[in-house]
Amino acid sequence: MSGGINAGDSKLAFESSEHVKVATTFDAMGLKEDLLRGIYAYNFEKPSAIQQRAILPIIRGRDVIAQAQSGTGKTATFSISMLQSIDTTLRETQALVLSPTRELAIQIQSVVLALGDYLNVQCHACIGGTSVGEDIRKLDYGQHIVSGTPGRVYDMIRRRHLRTKNIKMLILDESDELLNMGFKDQIYDVYRYLPPSTQVVLLSATLPQDVLEMTSKFMTDPVRILVKRDELTLEGIKQFFVAVEKEEWKFDTLCDLYDTLTITQAVIFCNTRRKVDWLSAKMKENNFQVSSMHGEMQQKERDEVMAEFRQGSSRVLITTDVWARGIDIANISLVINYDLPTNRENYIHRIGRSGRFGRKGVAINFVTVDDVRTLRDIEQFYSTQIDEMPVKLEDML
């Protein structure tokens, strides 16, 4: 994660609920000295657009709805705010972050620990698929910040290992996904255990109307920091489609593209776990090196795949939408939608992966005859244009 700001920031259109003060440097935010040291040690030089606008209202205790382009430094926005707000002399949980995936919860924990390196902060990732005993031990010891997935967090609160009486801040990251029906009930269960005065911060790349309606239930007069959707994430990302006519022809098309994929690193999205397993097995049968990940895999296995991909030893990753949210890998410049997403809002999460921090990226959509309408729907929804893929794709990378 290099410098917080990117060249596209000056062009972002902000719609905010009130005049939001812009702090153009980290020094201007009045942060703890040791937190500033952590920020600069993390190679952040200047705050990104969302950081310039959201950190101050959060540290002043306001409820905040922040919508920012994927890769603009959302995680650091709330991590810095939490680290500024907690009292490290009190070894009790004071801030709770809920994320839709285990990988994202772990990534947030690592950002908090890195930025809080000089603050002696305790931060635990409380996620399913890991040892309950270890969770209990860590929570009983005392954690300033807990980053977790809703199911395990609720379980630990219910069992009274995660003590909530000192929690003053609840962060909902990727809240469009979190507040989808799957997680909605669990979030309400967690929320009921928190002190009534708890500050709520909601972050997401997309904010559909139903999410905004739900915020009214547990937010008071929130500051809204919104980026207009047509600017969101797609700027700087070249989008193409390949007309494959039939589903069976997608595989040959992918094989033809393989040499181009491995120039940098590529992520290939399928809509189901079964399809991920089938495609990665078929690629390997044909002597193509790929790795794969989906939500049904054991946590340990998912961690290993992520580590290999982060280090660059694996260059092509086949996955489902579980991966599409917030996972930060620097070198990805190519995303392939082997299947177009069933939920058009996931499109931005998938291809936002390929241009993080304003870096250029390429997205390729495999389109059968049946997919044409979906593709047009995506174009219309994002006010964007998806052209036919050029012959010399490598020139784009």
Swiss-Prot record:
All copies of the Helicase ATP-binding domain together span 55-225
Q: What is known of its domains?
A: The Q motif is unique to and characteristic of the DEAD box family of RNA helicases and controls ATP binding and hydrolysis.
Q: Which GO terms of the molecular function aspect are on file?
A: ATP binding; ATP hydrolysis activity; mRNA binding; RNA helicase activity
Q: Which family does it belong to?
A: Belongs to the DEAD box helicase family. DDX48/FAL1 subfamily.
Q: What is the species listed in this Swiss-Prot or TrEMBL entry?
A: Mycosarcoma maydis (Corn smut fungus)
Q: Which residues form the Helicase C-terminal domain?
A: 236-397
Gene3D superfamilies from the entry? P-loop containing nucleotide triphosphate hydrolases (3.40.50.300)
Q: Where is this motif: DEAD box?
A: 173-176
Q: Which PANTHER family match?
A: ATP-DEPENDENT RNA HELICASE DBP3 (PTHR47958)
Q: What is this protein called?
A: ATP-dependent RNA helicase FAL1
Ranked from the top, the taxonomy reads: Eukaryota, Fungi, Dikarya, Basidiomycota, Ustilaginomycotina
